[in-house]
């Protein structure tokens, strides 16, 4: 097998990277640069758009992929069955879809909000990650929730989840397997994908059990099968935390350099294990 067929990167389609196309592209390229050095490759690792990959899948031993489309995931499933290593795997991406994720979290008792709450309720698209601001809607009361559900139905979105709004600090975390974990308060630096983070206001930095949060994130990553992952949690004024989101391969924008090294290390370790 030629060097070009050793490893291929699959870029996420822009529709799955709302307001984050450049950041998603940056982390994928950073990982490719790390892998190129670690594998002593003379040529750059090819980067293919996921839609092109689904139509004409190139052959490789390893696919480093941020793809989310069903067509691309079906292709990755076939590649896995043929013996290739895919990170993230198709299974890991699918298990991060909100309907499946919510069932998984509830079954394994991962801390999460109730379905509705007195301080409002979030309605979230359940069949895929948010592709636009309208895929996640805050509803101040039950009547607003019913109207929002009707709005989803009119858009052809029939799978959704609801989550009680929890007052407290919003914490955004990033992880790679069990080797890497970082968390940040997004309101501290002001970056927001859709602006929803501002509803909780400035972080008060309530004390909480950071080790427990990390262990629950690791556990959820293993339950879903996502190698590179991230998510959001709310920490209330009593120090209790609740997971409100969990995603396959985020942009890692707040810790890109560290994350790229961790992802590359994880890929290399899993690759060598697969060769045994």
Regions inferred by a protein language model and the residue ranges of each:
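Extreme N-terminal starter segment of soluble prokaryotic enzymes
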Residues: 2-10
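Conserved N-proximal alpha/beta basic substrate-recognition cap immediately N-terminal to
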Residues: 12-114, 129
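A short beta-strand motif that forms the metal-chelation/ATP-contact edge
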Residues: 60-64, 124, 173-175, 239-254
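Protein kinase-like catalytic core scaffold
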Residues: 121, 181, 229, 242-245
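Conserved anion/nucleotide-ligand pocket segment
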Residues: 121-147, 151
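A short linear hydrophobic-aromatic micro-motif
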Residues: 121-122, 158-162, 228-231
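Phosphate-binding site of ATP-dependent enzymes
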Residues: 139-224
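A long amphipathic alpha-helix within ATP-dependent nucleotide-binding catalytic cores
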Residues: 194-243, 255, 262-275
């Amino acid at each position: 097998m030629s060097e070009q067929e050793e490893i291929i990167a699959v870029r996420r389609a822009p529709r799955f990277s709302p307001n984050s196309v450049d950041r998603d592209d940056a982390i994928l390229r950073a990982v490719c640069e790390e892998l190129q050095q670690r594998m002593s490759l003379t040529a750059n690792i090819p980067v293919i758009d996921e839609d092109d990959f689904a139509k004409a899948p190139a052959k490789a031993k390893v696919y480093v992929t941020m793809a989310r489309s069903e067509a691309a995931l079906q292709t990755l499933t076939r590649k896995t069955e043929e013996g290739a290593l895919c990170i993230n795997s198709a299974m890991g991406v699918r298990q991060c879809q909100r309907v499946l994720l919510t069932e998984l979290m509830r079954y394994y008792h991962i801390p999460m909000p109730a379905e509705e709450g007195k301080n409002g309720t979030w309605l979230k698209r359940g069949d895929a990650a948010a592709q636009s601001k309208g895929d996640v809607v805050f509803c101040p009361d039950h009547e607003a929730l019913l109207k929002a559900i009707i709005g989803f139905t009119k858009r052809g979105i029939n799978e959704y989840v609801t989550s009680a709004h929890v007052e407290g600090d919003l914490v955004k975390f990033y992880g790679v397997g069990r080797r890497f974990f970082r968390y940040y308060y997004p309101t501290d630096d002001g970056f927001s994908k859709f602006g929803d983070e501002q509803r909780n206001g400035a972080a008060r930095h309530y004390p909480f059990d950071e080790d427990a949060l990390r262990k629950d994130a690791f556990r959820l990553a293993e339950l879903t099968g996502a190698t590179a992952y991230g998510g959001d949690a709310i920490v209330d004024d009593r120090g209790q935390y609740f997971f409100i989101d969990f995603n396959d391969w985020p942009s890692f924008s707040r810790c890109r350099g560290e994350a790229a090294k961790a992802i590359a290390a994880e890929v290399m370790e899993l690759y060598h294990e697969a060769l045994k």
